[in-house]
A protein has these predicted regions:
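Buried hydrophobic packing residues in well-ordered domains
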Residues: 25, 43, 61, 101, ...
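Acidic/histidine-enriched segments that form metal/cofactor-coordinating
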Residues: 2-7, 45, 72, 79-191, ...
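Short acidic/His-enriched helical or mixed secondary-structure segments at domain edges of catalytic enzymes
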Residues: 139-158, 237-256, 299-308, 355-401, ...
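M16/MPP (pitrilysin/insulinase) zinc-metallopeptidase core fold and M16-derived inactive scaffolds
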Residues: 35, 40-104, 170-173, 288-306
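An aromatic/glycine/proline-enriched structural segment found at the starts
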Residues: 2-5, 165, 173, 197-198, ...
């Protein structure tokens, strides 16, 4: 059995993440929080849909589904039933650069959840039957969320091909259903072997636990798992676009045109402060009815019925490594107003670059984002996942806890610099417009 190594940092204070690593490479972060008699357990794997090679698109998301279909000592569907029987909740989520699984249960159910997570990290059960079932489930998700809705997946599905060029950055997380249907259990087993090693994961525990006893329990359940090769960390950076480009899609049944622009952001890890400033800039520029773009584009000039701006392709910053994009999206009453909306967005960026933000508006925007982060951290499951993401991507789980304070320290100069960088980007985006109707009454 593997014993936990000495913690990388002391955790004498309640609520301070304690970090350790098992001999098999599993990174562990334990955070005591005794506000409620509950505990959250999350496992974050260093694989997302950007890691999928061509011909295997959608594997990361499909595998997330398969991880709930049973493991070496847990029958099909039993993982969910055991968590729910303890009074808990669970879920899994697939992102561009990681996949996360989490449970929130009463504190006395901690051992049960650690056993469940260790068992599926050891050996998930993948059969022809479970694979066929989950491919059908994914197909229904695609129909419900993408193909069966006029604005399905907008803009995270349609925008990347206009902004990026590589397969890793342009394909969406659902992938090509033809790739999934052509796969077999051996293909998914190979995916597990490549990416689901203990050394490619972070286990986070947040809640009413004693950190020392929790560390011993983790070592008991996860320590026997053998170390396996860990893939080199993938890098998905690509050159900046050198020309403007707006892709146009004619969509049947679309009520109104929709525009999305994607502007390359600073590296979220390598240039943390630049990315942070762009996040606050998004709140100033186009987040809510008091934002600059809503005031000018929606209320005053009536160029759009809705406008939003913010860091992160999916609308949620801090979830990825480089590259990421700043997204400006709008619903316009007519196709010809979309270009005017783009002009107005760049004019607003140029004004912020030249004059900087109104100090009071900056204070409000930063405070709103900080409050959102505090509310996220106040939920055990969300904090456990945040610790997993930040430990995985930044090597510092506690950075998630410090993020609200870092947001509040954003200066007018940093906002102006962020606006200058974005205003200098080429216009890359996508326009959805109602498909022409043909024919009429006979």
């Amino acid at each position: 059995m593997s014993a936990p190594a000495a913690p990388a940092q002391p955790a004498a204070e309640r609520g301070v993440p304690r970090r350790l690593r098992l001999d098999n490479g599993l990174r562990v972060v334990i955070t005591e929080d005794h506000d409620a008699p509950a505990v959250a357990v999350a496992v974050t794997y260093d694989v997302g849909f950007r890691s999928e090679p061509e011909g295997h698109s959608g594997f990361a998301h499909l595998f997330e589904h398969l991880m709930f279909e049973g493991s070496e000592h847990v029958g099909r569907g039993l993982h969910a039933r055991l968590v729910q029987a303890a009074g808990g909740i669970f879920n899994g989520t697939t992102h561009r650069d990681h996949t996360a699984y989490y449970q929130v249960v009463p504190a006395e159910a901690l051992e049960r959840v650690l056993f469940l997570e260790a068992d599926r990290m050891r050996a998930p059960r993948i059969t022809e039957e479970t694979l066929a079932h989950q491919i059908a489930v994914v197909g229904e998700e695609v129909r419900r969320n993408i193909t069966g809705r006029p604005y399905g997946g907008f803009p995270w599905v349609q925008l990347p091909p206009a902004v990026f060029t590589t397969f890793a950055n342009t394909h969406n997380g659902y992938g090509d259903l033809a790739d999934l249907r052509a796969s077999g259990p051996d293909d998914l087993a190979a995916f597990f072997d490549a990416y689901y090693a203990p050394g490619n994961a972070v286990l986070t525990v947040v809640g009413a636990v004693d950190a020392d006893r929790c560390a011993k329990s983790i070592a008991r359940h996860f320590g026997p798992l053998p170390a396996r090769p860990v893939p080199p960390r993938a890098r998905f950076g690509e050159p900046e676009p050198t020309a403007d480009r707006i892709d146009v899609h004619d969509v049947p049944g679309l009520p109104l045109p929709a525009l999305a622009l994607g502007l390359r952001l600073p590296d979220p890890v390598g240039d943390f402060d630049g990315y942070r400033a762009a996040t606050v800039l998004g709140a100033l520029l186009g987040d809510g009815e008091t934002s600059l773009l809503h005031r000018t584009v929606v209320r005053e000039r009536r160029l759009a019925t809705f406008v939003h701006a913010g860091a992160g392709l999916t609308g949620v910053p801090w979830e990825v490594r480089d590259p990421d994009v700043f997204v400006i999206r709008a619903m316009t009453p007519a196709e010809h107003t979309a270009e005017a909306v783009a002009d107005a967005a760049f004019e607003a960026l140029e004004r912020l670059a030249d004059k900087g933000p109104d100090p009071a508006a900056l204070t409000r925007a930063a405070a709103r984002l900080a409050t959102e982060q505090y509310l996220t951290l106040d939920r055990l499951g969300s904090r456990a996942r945040a610790h997993g993401r930040f430990e995985l991507h930044h090597g510092d789980a506690a950075l998630a806890d410090r993020l609200p304070e870092r947001l509040l320290r954003t200066t007018p100069r940093q906002i102006a610099d962020a606006a200058t960088a974005l205003a200098g980007r080429h216009r890359r985006g996508v326009l959805l417009r109602p498909a022409p109707t043909h024919g009429g009454r006979g």
